[in-house]
């Protein structure tokens, strides 16, 4: 017997899944120094830049006869020029028939996802201090736009790792901290941020060592945690930037010093090298790290002096390129560097001998950028944006990243459009001599 042909209606419903958000590992906001978070409230400060002091530097003379030296107030600036927003809009019909259909408004879930997205964007921007790639922005017709420049005053010039050899053991971490301290370092509050994917091999090698108490803790959490004396705190992030190096680093080319912009060695901020590929437009990229090589025939090994005391350390001289540099038709490349190198006596002397022709240096290839921060040297500003009268405005806080933001709700009169905007402005700076980049294979 044949089945009858029924005419049945199908009703598709939209059900809540209650799935959690795919969160990121947010630590930069957590470890930042928020002393200048609301610097716009400082009465005497005008503009979006606040300047703060760095410890003064002096030198010591032998004997009891004084040789007076200038007292110099060292400063660094924190510029609040970053801004971002996440927004969405609905018609009145969409609002009543879809977004607020449930007893619990779906608007809350839209807002939660928007806040998480913006928080991750800000966290990733803070991480760019690791390779000095935070963009310099300006305001044009109300919109924040990049100028093409970078905040090269922020971020480390020293580094650990070669970008090729894996960093996967506690011994390497211990050597890294030893190198960091050898130059001069704060005694408390050292923080290390590692790529999350590099944590398991480090923990794995640690579990192979006979350290029952430490290994019990690690096996329970599978985290590096803290170790050392005094303890060093280890964090992990999945938002760390990758330094895209120039040809010099990726081709492992050896550069040879031709000249510097200051032959006296009093203030070297630019070095001309030979040895790059002829007419290579991408020889050096801003943020590239270079290290002077040892055992060059007829040349003294370059070493940094300790930051305080001016004693020759064990640390080879490492520098950071502050701008892209192209090679000319002879394979020469002129590199602007940070920090300024000084071999002449004085409070800011930082190297043992002058940089002269014939010395050699090599740059790192592409690498993932981990970071060491000494104490509270990573500063963050995140001022509260004003209310947007007559639209309802509130201050929001993202519990996962710690980001503070403004939320504004409004409608376009007569246009059947209602929108929600989450926005924030901020700035950050990492004191160079208080930090070190960790070069993991990219």
Predicted regions and their residues:
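Short active-site-adjacent helix-start/loop capping segments
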Residues: 59-63, 86-88, 95-99, 416, ...
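Long, position-biased, composition-driven segments near the start of the mature protein
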Residues: 2-4, 93-95, 436-440
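N-terminal "assembly arms/tails" that initiate or stabilize quaternary assembly
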Residues: 1-80
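A short, structural micro-pattern
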Residues: 44-46, 70-72, 82, 186, ...
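Short acidic, glycine/tyrosine-flanked loop/strand segments centered on an H-E-D-like triad
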Residues: 73-102
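Short beta-strand segments
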Residues: 50, 76, 86, 317-319
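Core alpha/beta structural scaffold of self-assembling particle/tube/pore-forming proteins
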Residues: 99-442
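Short, conserved beta-strand segments within well-ordered enzyme catalytic domains
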Residues: 51-53, 87-89, 193
């Amino acid at each position: 017997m044949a089945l009858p042909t029924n005419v049945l209606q199908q009703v598709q419903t939209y059900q809540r899944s209650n799935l959690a958000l795919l969160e990121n590992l947010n630590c930069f906001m957590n470890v930042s120094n928020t002393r200048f978070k609301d610097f716009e409230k400082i009465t005497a400060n005008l503009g979006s830049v606040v300047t703060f002091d760095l410890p003064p530097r002096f030198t010591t003379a032998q004997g009891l006869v004084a040789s007076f030296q200038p007292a110099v107030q060292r400063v660094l600036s924190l510029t609040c020029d970053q801004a971002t927003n996440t927004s969405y809009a609905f018609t009145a019909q969409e609002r009543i028939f879809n977004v607020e259909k449930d007893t619990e408004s779906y608007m809350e879930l839209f807002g939660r996802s928007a806040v998480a997205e913006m928080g991750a964007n800000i966290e990733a921007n803070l991480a760019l201090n690791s390779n000095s790639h935070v963009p310099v922005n300006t305001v044009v017709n109300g919109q924040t736009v990049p100028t093409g420049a970078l905040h090269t005053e922020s971020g480390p010039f020293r580094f650990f790792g070669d970008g090729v050899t894996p960093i996967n053991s506690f011994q390497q971490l211990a050597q890294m901290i030893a190198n960091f301290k050898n130059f001069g370092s704060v005694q408390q509050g050292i923080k290390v941020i590692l790529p999350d994917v590099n944590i398991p091999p480090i923990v794995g090698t640690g579990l192979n060592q006979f350290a029952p108490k430490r290994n019990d803790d690690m096996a329970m959490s599978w985290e590096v945690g803290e170790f050392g004396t005094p303890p060093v705190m280890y964090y992990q992030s999945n938002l760390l930037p990758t330094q895209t190096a120039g040809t010099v680093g990726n081709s492992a080319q050896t550069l040879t010093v031709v000249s510097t912009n200051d032959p006296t060695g009093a203030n070297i901020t630019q070095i001309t090298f030979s040895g790059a590929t002829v007419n290579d437009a991408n020889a050096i990229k801003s943020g590239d790290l270079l290290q002077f090589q040892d055992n060059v025939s007829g040349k003294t090994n370059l070493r940094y002096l300790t930051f305080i005391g001016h004693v020759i350390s064990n640390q080879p001289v490492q520098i950071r390129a502050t701008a892209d540099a192209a090679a000319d038709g002879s394979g020469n490349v002129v590199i602007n560097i940070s920090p300024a190198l000084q071999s002449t006596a004085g409070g800011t002397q930082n190297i043992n001998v002058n940089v002269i022709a014939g010395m050699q240096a090599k740059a790192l290839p592409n690498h993932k950028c981990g970071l060491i921060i000494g104490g509270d040297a990573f500063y963050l500003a995140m001022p509260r944006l004003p209310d947007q009268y007559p639209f309802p405005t509130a201050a929001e806080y993202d519990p996962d990243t710690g980001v503070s933001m403004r939320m504004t709700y409004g409608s376009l009169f007569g246009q059947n459009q209602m929108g929600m905007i989450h926005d924030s402005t901020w700035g950050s700076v990492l004191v160079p001599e208080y930090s070190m980049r960790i070069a993991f294979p990219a």
